[in-house]
């Protein structure tokens, strides 16, 4: 296999990111570029299940910027995935179709299990000591914008995993709502 250039796009609750890699059998993979754009997609989604038009516009502009970068790097293949914010939309198919029409990107909405499986897979690929670390009882916490994932490993296997809808963006939203309705907010927190 010759060298191939691949882009991984993550549409998350509070950030849209893209990593571009060079892949080959000889060297494995090498990161060429890492771009992150702060965009709180989960903000409206977690409270009302909707992505407002302005937020969709900014998302599509960002993805079109990513597309130009991909062309500059000669990207041959890509994978664009949406997580919690897109997963919890009341109209995910309509939003994914809008993204496709406006950017040309086919976005795959990952289930919670798929999202975390890919996360562990990437940790295992990057962290040399990962396999050794999960031989003995190990907990991995993944704090995202929409959820907190707790996974327990033992003897090189995933024993159990639990996802709690307590991500940083959700908690911040709840605290902001609480602050508006509570007299002694500072004492409560």
Language-model region placement:
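Acidic, divalent-metal-coordinating active-site segment for phosphoryl/phosphodiester hydrolysis
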Residues: 146-149
